[in-house]
Amino acid sequence: RDATRAFSLPCIEEPDVEADDIIASYAREAQRQGWHVTIVSSDKDLMQLVGERDGARIDMLDTMKNARIYINEVEEKFGVGPDKVGDVLALMGDSVDNIPGIFGVGPKTASKLIAEHGGLTAALDAAEGMKKSKLKERLIEHRADAELSRVLVTLREDCSLPVTLEDMKLDEVPPEPLAAFLGKHGFTSLLKRLEAGNGSPSRATDLNPAKPETAGAPASSAGNRQPLPEFPAVDRSAYECVQTLDRLEEWIARAMAARLVAVDTETSSLDCMLCDLVGVSLALGPNDACYVPLGHGGSDMFAERPEQVDKAAALAALAPLLASDAVVKVFHNGKYDLNVLARNGFAVAPVEDTMIMSFDLDAGRQLDGIGGGHGMDELASRHLGHTCLTFKEICGTGKKAIPFGEVPLDKATEYAAEDADVTWRLYKTLKPRLATEGGTRIYERVDRPLVPVVAQMERHGIKVDRTRLAKLSEEFAGEIARLEKEIHAIAGTEFTVRSPKQLGEVLFDTLGYKGGKKGKSGQYSTDQSVLERLSGEGAEIAGKVLEWRQLAKLKNTYTDALQQAINPETGRVHTSYSLVGAQTGRLSSTEPNLQNIPIRTEIGRQIREAFVADDGNVLLAADYSQIELRLAAHMADVPTLKEAFAQGEDIHSRTAIEMFGEVNRDTRGRAKTINFAILYGISRWGLAGRLGVEADEAQAMIDTYFQRFPGIQKYIVRTLEQVRERGYSETLFARKTWFPRIASKNQAERQGSERAAINAPIQGTSADIIKRAMVRMMPALEAAGLGHVRMLLQVHDELVFELPEGDVDAASAVIERVMAGAAEPAVKLDIPLGVDIGTGTSWGAAH
């Protein structure tokens, strides 16, 4: 993003759309208009596009090899033409893109099979006639994997194009943002060429290079800033490798006296629930840093291990420092380090986190025209003018990569101690900004105390029933097969259900359903909205295809994948939460993502049934009731909605009465859609698509909504005015989210920013409230004698706990009280927060 925007190139992002699909759609559209297209990539999937149509060519450029890729190069690589590349990929799979393929089938075998049989289906069909072999068994047994893989590698060529090709024409590159980008990343020769051609931008405001002997930091953006501290340039030769217990104890004594130490850990892997601790680094000031190796060497039984402190002795020496309330421990992404240290028996407090500081100051903000991520390397470059050593530089890549524990100690010290040194410098840079830029409240009262809470939740994990998951996978596979047969029976012909092209032809050509629209690729659109419309009009086949697609996705994403995610040591699934993953402040969940399991469907319930409590325990799910609508009523000051909530009315039924004059299943459903859609700044076209009506009718509904609830429209107008004026939105708890594209000349970017800005104060306030509840929860439970209750998950507006069955009543009372009162005393809401609580031996049963 940073580079493209610096060069004034369009940066196109579409929610829920793969980048490859956007590239494919633009490439095909340009080709249709007669342009020669070069895709700058070496991605195997995109090689399916290479070739010529109607005199217009698509080729590729591999910049790593400085090589063009034409049809001949594709055939040389895959043994087949571009049109069969997807078939080859479906057999061989791709671990990088999570394409399963068929285990044991490599590129050569896959190419040979496709070349010999002419396509994937034919190759799989031919397996039955093969001589007995492992290959035959694999092709038959894993046919479904190959067929699913073929869907996954198929490029969509009919995506909407938010920026027209005409608007992509580049006339002139404004020099200021480009100069800032080049200066930030050290492209000095390019910067000189730019200045020679366009004149020099204001160096004082745009580049602000560091003095030769110091490493200052350009970090200008909207708003006033305190002068940033200047530090000596990073000198890796000054770092110490601590190899004796005496020297370690001297460092610990100095840290105790300093009352503040930056800490970083080095591990054997990125999985903090399974990794070994390889070393610890400490920093007490700029260039005053050390690395304590604890687990280097040992993989080669014939090689002598390097001298290092005995691990048990080192851990015993470090424990008082890490536990001391008198010494602040500063981390970057401290949640990871806290889990690593907890795995080795450490209790760590108090904790500061520079990644969280950066997020609370600059979420969404672009600095010097450049994007604002929160990783250490990016922050070091942005704020310190320093380029950190990378893990790849130290450990290598590919087949030559070595584990960190095998890195020579001199190199390991440079890398590890630098991390602690940079963390210390970032702390001294960012901490003062919290006070001067209004970030202290959200950092100190919400996000900083949340770090150890979330770390503990990750360590708890949640038990899953592997047998139940395997059974669900088997049931889903059977249902998928059954649905496929029923779909074929309705169609009167066999076809590949997962193929949008074949499905479109069956629906609109063979069966003759009306309303089929071909995209620019010449294929009928068969996306979810099309199928939902057809199903609503009585097309049985469309409903079955929707069900087939959902089952296939859930099987691949959850019932199969969750079995692989079970920790072999604990038998539980340990998801990883990101505290900086969503600009509004919401937590995001990965590895596995537990937040995308369908909420209100029978299938989603079945998957949740596989998340279970230990014997004698139950799971308790506590969910805020319609919290965003309650917050909207408060923040927009809507008397009608306030009254409805105060009286305990069904809010969607009340909206239906206000909008349509009556309540029935249809009007309530429409009212519910409208309630949430308008809070997200939906357009009339977007609402029309969701409700299946014409745009004019949708606009009339929006107008009626604003007439019945005028406070909502005033809130939207007021919020957008404030964001345009200040550059950021703000929650009730003073969390800022920046919107640098709110005044973009690009309509798609501007409208996307406006929609996000409308919702950010509401969604962000909701996130702040549940975070405040999480921070307060365990102290409240401990005070009630319920410290053994474990908080396991946070999913959207829900918290999930595990506890003995006999403690349900007492724990429910505490949990409801904490969650309902989480906004206070900082914010007094006009509408009480409702909390729904359920329990059961499984997560599904708790709903």
Give residue spans per PLM region.
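Short active-site loop/helix that positions an aromatic residue
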Residues: 47-52, 270-271, 280, 335-346, ...
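C-terminal structured "cap/appendage" subdomains that terminate the fold
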Residues: 141, 167-171, 777-836
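Conserved "right-hand" nucleotidyltransferase catalytic core of DNA-directed polymerases
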Residues: 142-304, 349, 367-371, 379, ...
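Extended two-metal-dependent nuclease catalytic cores across DNA- and RNA-processing enzymes
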Residues: 1-162, 377, 381
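Conserved catalytic core of nucleic-acid polymerases
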Residues: 402-405, 456-459, 567-582, 587, ...
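Short alpha-helix plus adjacent loop in nuclease-associated cores
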Residues: 46-80, 136-138, 290-312, 316-320, ...
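Acidic beta-strand-to-loop metal/phosphate-binding motif
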Residues: 13-15, 38-42, 262, 326-334, ...
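Short beta-strand
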Residues: 14, 39, 496-498, 790-795
